[in-house]
């Protein structure tokens, strides 16, 4: 069968996207399929390889990139949360590195070299920490000691907790209440709106 998370699939997708771009066609591709059955290292390896290659090849739209497992046969809320961090990192890696008078900060460099010897107290550093860094929701960037003291919680455990938090209070609001009322008036929908919320 198809090995959607394989390097060969990544290569084929990359080639197809580059051909579409060469001929001036808008393009859409799936990427992020994995043959893994769970939220494990294989899943991360296959998804990140395929999504990164599709993105770096210039895909206009990448679909089916988050939450699926087992060759697109299973959807996982935990995987959606993990994949959100992964896709954020991939998107961040595609950004340009702006080089201009502001980003070079030559005066700050001169002042730092001649004074404190570090940039930690500079307003510019703090500002860039807010704009230039992606802070993941569940990926762990702590030290081994901090991670151990916090209970050695892995990414799947953190993502499961985060998914439950999101689903607990989430209710779609992209359909206006008037439309929902009209739909309910025209179709026999047996489940009440308040029961559609996660318990």
What are these regions (language model features)?
Residues 1-86:
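Glycine-rich anion/phosphate-binding loop at the beta-strand->alpha-helix junction
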């Amino acid at each position: 069968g198809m090995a959607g998370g394989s390097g060969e699939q990544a290569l084929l997708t990359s080639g197809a996207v580059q051909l579409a771009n060469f001929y001036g066609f808008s393009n859409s591709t799936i990427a992020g399929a994995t043959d893994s059955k769970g939220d494990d290292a294989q899943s991360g390896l296959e998804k990140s390889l395929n999504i990164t290659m599709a993105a770096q090849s210039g895909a206009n739209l990448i679909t089916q990139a988050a939450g699926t497992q087992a060759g697109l046969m299973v959807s996982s809320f935990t995987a959606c949360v993990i994949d959100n961090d992964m896709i954020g990192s991939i998107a961040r890696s595609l950004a340009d590195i702006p080089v201009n008078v502001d980003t070079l900060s030559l005066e700050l460099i001169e002042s730092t070299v001649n004074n404190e010897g570090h940039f930690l107290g500079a307003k510019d550093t703090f500002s860039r920490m807010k704009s230039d860094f992606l802070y993941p929701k569940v990926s762990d960037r702590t030290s081994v000691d901090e991670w151990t003291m916090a209970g050695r919680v892995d990414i799947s455990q953190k993502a499961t907790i985060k998914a439950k938090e999101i689903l607990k209070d989430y209710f779609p609001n992209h359909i206006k209440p008037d439309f929902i009322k009209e739909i309910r008036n025209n179709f026999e929908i047996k489940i009440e709106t308040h029961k559609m919320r996660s318990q």
